[in-house]
Amino acid sequence: MEWLNVLESQGQALLGPTAWLVVWTIIKIVIIAVPIILCVAYLTYWERKMIGWMHVRLGPNRVGFKGLLQPFADVFKLLTKEVVVPSQANKILFIVAPVVTLMPALAAWAVVPFGPEAVLANVNAGLLYVMAITSIGVYGVIVAGWASNSKYAFLGALRASAQMVSYELAISFVLVTVLLVSGSLNMNEIVLGQGRGWFAERGLTFLSWNWLPLLPLFVIYVISAVAETNRHPFDVVEGESEIVAGHMVEYSGMAFALFFLGEYANMILLSAMASIMFLGGWMSPIDIAPLNWIPGWIWLGIKTFFVVSLFIWFRASFPRYRYDQIMRLGWKIFIPLTGVWLVVVAIWMQTPWNIWR
């Protein structure tokens, strides 16, 4: 990273230390935010393509080569539509709610490491920051349901808040277990900790990642992430056959699109977190020269893409759960299981067979 040191020294000489710090932080935010927004846009394209292939259809194939410009067509369509605010709605909160849903999903990327040194803010409490910032998103859903002054929207918001809080608990127990085996809240340290051990010393890095010893927690995390993002088969929040579009029923135009941007941004974020917590983050699966030449951010992207594709596969394969079934799964199965596994791992770490030393 010699060129970064040269750029930093030249920037400080030109603008001064304080001004350069502000400018450099803004540049890093743009470098992270723009690709994330593009990934969100093209995730909608990949979802339609993948479901189309699973249903033996073509999917989007008209706008641009193989339909690659379809996300831009969708954006232009939504930009030209009017944002209709209901006459009885709380207008300020009605407009603020979609923004509150999207912003935490983007702000959480500040501590996500794309490589050993490629991170916007390498803070020691990175995992705690992600858990805290992502929990704010539920407020946008609640505010949208209340501000719309609609029965359908309010019912959807009530469902959403209960479901998201329930599965946040399961995810929190999973992340606490990862914290226990890693011994650090720093995201970089969590990734580096998965590169140590008997298998890693012999080049089989993928067998030293947390997915193998914590496999039940990995499965619970992925399913809970699907429920946390209100994705099918846990999308009773916006169950079309029951409450139309849930908390989004009164929204249109770009305000409506912001909710979907937030949903897909959360999908990518939780998939990236799964890659960092369980799949070795930016590390290559096998410690050999050709694979080690590939930049870490590409490995992180490949693993994140794999987990995101699981979200889409679930949508195309499983029927929607009833609301009572979703809550029973979260409170009576996942939360007790994660709590028990946390105790099991804690005991395991005190035995001579501790593999995380």
Swiss-Prot record:
Bilayer disposition of the protein: Multi-pass membrane protein
Function: NDH-1 shuttles electrons from NADH, via FMN and iron-sulfur (Fe-S) centers, to quinones in the respiratory chain. The immediate electron acceptor for the enzyme in this species is believed to be ubiquinone. Couples the redox reaction to proton translocation (for every two electrons transferred, four hydrogen ions are translocated across the cytoplasmic membrane), and thus conserves the redox energy in a proton gradient. This subunit may bind ubiquinone.
Enzyme Commission number(s) of this protein: 7.1.1.-
Location in or out of the cell: Cell inner membrane
Protein name: NADH-quinone oxidoreductase subunit H
Family assignment from sequence similarity: Belongs to the complex I subunit 1 family.
Chain ranges passing through the membrane: 20-40, 92-112, 127-147, 165-185, 206-226, 268-288, 294-314, 329-349
GO biological process: aerobic respiration
GO MF annotation, one: NADH dehydrogenase activity
Subunit text: NDH-1 is composed of 14 different subunits. Subunits NuoA, H, J, K, L, M, N constitute the membrane sector of the complex.
Organism this protein belongs to: Bordetella avium (strain 197N)
GO CC annotation terms, alphabetical: plasma membrane
InterPro entries membership: NADH_UbQ_OxRdtase_su1/FPO, NADH_UbQ_OxRdtase_su1_CS
Keyword presence, Nucleus: no
Source lineage: Bacteria, Pseudomonadati, Pseudomonadota, Betaproteobacteria, Burkholderiales
Reactions this protein catalyses: a quinone + NADH + 5 H(+)(in) = a quinol + NAD(+) + 4 H(+)(out)
Main location, first listed in the record: membrane
Alphabetically ordered keywords of this record: Cell inner membrane, Cell membrane, Membrane, NAD, Quinone, Translocase, Transmembrane, Transmembrane helix, Ubiquinone
